[in-house]
Amino acid sequence: MSNIIVEHQYSHRLKLTVVRAENVTKGAFGDLLDTPDPYVELSVPTTPESRKRTRHINNDINPKWNETFEFILDPNQSNVLEVTLMDANYVMDETLGTAKYSLSKLKVAQMEHVTLSIGKTTKVFLDLLLEVCASTDLRFSMTLCDQEKLFMQTRRDRVMLSIKKLLKMENPRFLPSSPREVPTIAILGSGGGFRAMVGFSGVMKALYESGVFDCATYVAGLSGSTWYMSMLYSHPEFPAKGPGDINKELMNRVSNNPLKLLLPQNINRYVKALWKKKSAGQPVTFTDIFGMLIGETLIPGRMNIKLSSLKGKINEGQSPLPLFTCLHVKPDVSELMFADWVEFSPYEIGMAKYGTFMSPGLFGSKFFMGSVVKQYEENPLHFLMGVWGSAFSILFNRVLGVKETTSSSTMEEELEQIKPEHIVGDDSADNEEETQRGGTESADAEDERQRHAQASWVQRMLTSIMGDTTLFTTREGRAGKVHNFMLGLNLNSTLPFSPFSGITHQTSLEEEVDAVTDPDEFERIYEPLDVKSKKIHVVDSGLTFNLPYPLILRCQRGVDLIISFDFSARPSDSSPPFKELLLAEKWARMNKLPFPKIDSKVFDREGLKECYVFKPAKGDKNCPTIIHFVLANINFRNFKAPGVPRDSDKDIEFGDFDIFDEPASPYSTFNFKYNNQAFKRLHDLMEFNTLNNIEVIKEAIKDSILLRRENPARCSVSLSLSEIENKKFLKRDNSIAKRPT
């Protein structure tokens, strides 16, 4: 494994104690009418979460507070402390005076006792202590976190036994003789709404019952597949209870349309819950409500469960590590041109492009320069489910049936009708203080204002959802939004996903630029995130391509065999099934990641098959093998199980269906209700296709074992930072202060 540390800038922590004040006055005339009820407001405009205040003290001209506050400061900014003395009143609080103090005067680790004069007679006494932040709440590294490394070791021992069990009748030379020979296997599920979720449920049943699931180290999902993974891994009886039983629960849940949850009494409950989130200072969009709908449909008894709580399913290596994904996108830029992949696991959330990760409980909190300045509760799993599948909140008009369109139009065609600025907006000017009015109003007046604001916001949300759907044409209603956890960081350079970039042979220019669907695809993927934007937008990863390959192509994970299942929509059942895989290949090559050559002409030579195998070129020791399953009804029409023909009219009728060709197909990407027959057909089809190719999977596992044996240092990365050609994002600022030693 490599030990690559991504450079980041240090910050200062200011500890400020408001000690006391002397001779607080409202002026000669004001003092005759009333004795002040003073409190102090503090502000450092150059830092987030910059407004803080003491309690007020009644009728005291010499108040003593002794209250301590903290600010995270950028030492390269001209930071100025603004101190405002206030008088609390029943209606509107009164400003008594303001003083400023330049924080550049402070020296690290030296306490300063500061006296500020306000007016002619009033003094405010402060204690200021400046510290260097010795650690941050973000982890800056390309390596896997310690928890995942420990998981991999524990899981490897279990996988070794499981592979021996799966291949028990094989020649011993095909079995791993040591943990080093155990291949790392990843299972992938694509997006595709409930079609992907139901199809993946059949896949997982087959993999679980055949023993292949126990041989996998990772399960990665995107959009609809993440919904199934969320339901499976959050189930209290999983993994002791397998997908076979759990899928019956899923069938019952999807037999009712989740839109029935849009009854006024439910919506009112959702929106009021979201007001609490908004009033605490977190951004709220329609993705939050969509996540509630998906959660109430799939995990109704587990709405409070968190991503981090899924660690209990994997800590002993008893199940593959689940990986989920979304995209960070920019305003006014197509997701196909620019997108940063965000990965989620029960251990960490982050972006490998920047080597920046955090614990799941911190995602959504306010950060500055790598440190949390305001922490919120961990988001519930259903919120993340809404983010991971947010294409459907973006296209909710279509889901509702509000927009008239042809049933054959694809999600891509629908999204082309929506300009990027309607999905996301520029948040650089967002007012982070929108819910923090500080001391300008009395407590009673503030409470009344909050009640009116809540009522107004709830009414607007209800009207938008139940009425004219204006919510869907504004940036507020489109994409998920969270506080920017990279706010204030210094992106001088970034490390490529691949530690071999710039050292191995360069991909040919022709391979670099060949378009799969659009000449502009991935054109701007080397650009950096905007570290000045206070919030970032996070959307469905399927908006760039519909397979979560970036998660498991990280060289640190050392994946040998990828078993991917693509449930993406195609124009017809007979259409070539490689579009998403070709996009994944192009993305990998642009990031210098090992990826087998995808020969799309295999479709012309061999026709439509249940799965295709793509192997690395001879001598390529670090490239994974890919088994790519597609959504196709071929042998299932005639066989109810591998080798078992259909022998009754009822059986034959059950297996005789198309997925994309039928005009009234229940398998539309936008269908959120599956009757039992539609569910069983798709579920059983993908279970059959998987079981029908178990021998293909076994052969690939054997090949991976032999490759590991022949290349014991496979995927071992020991390159130093100086050996890697960094991609320059921004010119280095020579004025950046060096961290003191």
Curated annotation (Swiss-Prot):
Residues carrying Phosphoserine: S498
Record PROSITE patterns: C2, PLA2C
Stretches the record annotates as Phospholipid binding: 1-172
Recorded GO MF terms: calcium ion binding; calcium-dependent phospholipase A2 activity; calcium-dependent phospholipid binding; lysophospholipase activity; phospholipase activity
Occurrences of domain PLA2c (ranges): 132-729
Keyword Nucleus: no
The name this protein goes by in its record: Cytosolic phospholipase A2
